[in-house]
C-alpha cells in the first residue's frame, strides 16, 4: 500500500485494529448472506427482533458489513468504513443484546462484544488509517484522522443508528417469564 519505513506505534495499532475488525465485519456480512439460512434467514431474524422490513435491512446490514470490512482492511476512507461497524453493531446492541445484560455468555447473549466493536471502531476513526493504508497512499490520511475522523464515525455511525431505530425498529413485546 505504501512504504512502511517510519511506521510507528499508532500506525501499527491502526493496522492491527483495522484488519481484525475488518475481517470480523466481512465474516459477519458473509454469514448473513451465505451462512445458515442465508439472506432470507437473516431477514426473518431481523423481523423477529422488530427491524422491518427484514429483507431490506438484512441486505443493507450485510452490504455495509462486507464493504466496510474490506475498506477497513485496506485503510480506505477509514472513518467511513469504521462508521459501518458502529452503525451495524450499535443497532445490534440496542435491538438485540442490551436486554440480556453485559456478559455475552448470558442467555440471549449480552452486549459486551458488540459494545467492544463499537468502541474499537470509534478508536479506529480517531487513529485514521495510519501509515500503512490507502488513505495515506492517496493523500487523504491527514484529513481523516483525529477529531475529524472520530466525528465522522460518531456522526454517521451513531446518526444512522438513531435514524434506523427511530424509523424502522418496533421491538416485539417481551414475553412474561
Say what each PLM segment does.
Residues 1-37, 41, 55, 78-177:
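Extended, low-polarity transmembrane helix blocks
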Residues 63-73:
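Hydrophobic, membrane-inserted alpha-helices
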Residues 27-30, 50, 71-74:
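Short amphipathic alpha-helical interaction patches enriched in hydrophobic/aromatic residues
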Residues 42-47:
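Interfacial loop at the N-terminal end of multi-pass membrane proteins
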Residues 49-59:
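Short, amphipathic, aromatic/basic-enriched membrane-interface segments that mark the entry/exit
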Amino acid at each position: 500500500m505504501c512504504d512502511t519505513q517510519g511506521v510507528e506505534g499508532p500506525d501499527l495499532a491502526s493496522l492491527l485494529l483495522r484488519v481484525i475488525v475488518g475481517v470480523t465485519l466481512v465474516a459477519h456480512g458473509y454469514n448473513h448472506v451465505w451462512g445458515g439460512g442465508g439472506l432470507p434467514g437473516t431477514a426473518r431474524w431481523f423481523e423477529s427482533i422488530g427491524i422491518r422490513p427484514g429483507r431490506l435491512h438484512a441486505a443493507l446490514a450485510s452490504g455495509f458489513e462486507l464493504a466496510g470490512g474490506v475498506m477497513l482492511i485496506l485503510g480506505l476512507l477509514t472513518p467511513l468504513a469504521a462508521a459501518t461497524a458502529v452503525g451495524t453493531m450499535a443497532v445490534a446492541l440496542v435491538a438485540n443484546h442490551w436486554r440480556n445484560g453485559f456478559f455475552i455468555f448470558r442467555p440471549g447473549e449480552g452486549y459486551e462484544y458488540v459494545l467492544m466493536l463499537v468502541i474499537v471502531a470509534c478508536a479506529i476513526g480517531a487513529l485514521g488509517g495510519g501509515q500503512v493504508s490507502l488513505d495515506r497512499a492517496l493523500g487523504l490520511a491527514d484529513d481523516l484522522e483525529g477529531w475529524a475522523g472520530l466525528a465522522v464515525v460518531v456522526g454517521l455511525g451513531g446518526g444512522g443508528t438513531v435514524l434506523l431505530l427511530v424509523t424502522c425498529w418496533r421491538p416485539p413485546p417481551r414475553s412474561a417469564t
